[in-house]
């Protein structure tokens, strides 16, 4: 007999060899039905794995984040199973979980399009209803290679060859087998709420030199109600797509001559300036001086900083006069060079620097997505050099600044997470222990609740992440605060302590809106293009009922502009109804409509974008009304 301890502290006795599913059944049939896997002594295991010794057990159900992830991963396998049934000559590659769903990449021998997704989905439902048990076997690497070679799965063979482990897991459901670490669901019958959403191209291993594969995306949920809610959200998200709205509002465009880099139009630049000017004022308030550093630096700098060894595949490189250079993927190393131009005392610290720095990252073409995933972007970076004793106070200030910024931009619902050390990192464990604890202490001191994300930190230090929830419930990872003991040391940053000794400062990396491009894309989707007055590229459109009011329209337009209002003058010889509809579609917050009566009385009639009639007032009163809204960030 063995003893199993549960999360509530209770201990129960079971026969050796019992599995988590059996344990769940002994508690209740409904719990067994919902059980996806289990943590056995903090190791995530399949629900049917045998338990042979005393342990601590935590059952994972569809209500747990891990359970939903397992459900989605298993649904990816179901997708591959269905594809192999329908298109037997297809080679399968990889099928990971992504936000809200999964995808699987295939090498089809025939042409596949969006129109084929319903057929594949129908086959998935047929296979799920078979209630096929899901099991796995562990085999030597050589045996796994032979197994997949015999099936003509060359991509699987390549994957196995690249794995250092000598033992491989092969999962099987019905007549389909796939290579996977697991865990997976006990039975396919639990897969009831899923849908295939789209199809795209993707290079094998993200390398454009390799074969183009077909990527099929899907979503999977614990219940049909959850699925329906998500699909409704997707429909709303489609309406809010910043790429579509950006085209309507004439904000920006992309073209193949410069993939992943936006061409900003006048209206887009107006929004950009508001965001940048706001952040500049916020940085001034929090004591940051502004710097500007080079886009290109000798490759030796990136070797010293650690980027060359940890980030080289994402960097653009160039040569000049027999020297190797790299276009910066991050702003931090060049910022350290500004710090290093002077000798610093401990009395000078903290030193806070801010930069709207343009960076370039060689993102795979298949991952590019409008403003949300680009190859060149401007980061609102801040770098603080301080003593270890000052870290917590500085982090508290930065958290406070983040809260203020997000609320002013209309994001009132956000979560904070701490991303802990990744496997691929620089620095020793003692330094990482100290770094992670400092961030926790700073948030604890500020009474801020947070979630821990093991393995998600940057290669040079742990980070605090701010995840913003938008108007339709989507979560966006936005600002970061990163603690770095390594880079200042690698790049020779020092200060003189109170004993006259040289010390290495702690470096805090901070981005609040992050990529300005991405943040503007978020704002467009959050507000569905109806930006608040202070951000709107055009705040007021002035138009006359007939051309008889042209002179008065010009007079009102000039008065608005003199008061700092971003106005547009519409003197076209069109019907007033047409003008109103057009400027409404362009999301202009206020329309000023001028007729004979307004001209004679020197007043204006105002209509909101929503259609609400605000009546008549003087231009001065209207400007005061607008200014009040702008100052309040409404």
Swiss-Prot record:
Enzyme class, spelled out: ligase
Catalytic activity: tRNA(Thr) + L-threonine + ATP = L-threonyl-tRNA(Thr) + AMP + diphosphate + H(+)
GO molecular function, one term: metal ion binding
Metal-binding among keywords: yes
Cofactor binding annotation: Binds 1 zinc ion per subunit.
Keywords: Aminoacyl-tRNA synthetase, ATP-binding, Cytoplasm, Ligase, Metal-binding, Nucleotide-binding, Protein biosynthesis, RNA-binding, tRNA-binding, Zinc
HAMAP family xrefs: Thr_tRNA_synth (MF_00184)
NCBIfam families: thrS
Protein name per the record: Threonine--tRNA ligase
Organism name: Francisella tularensis subsp. tularensis (strain WY96-3418)
Gene it is expressed from: thrS
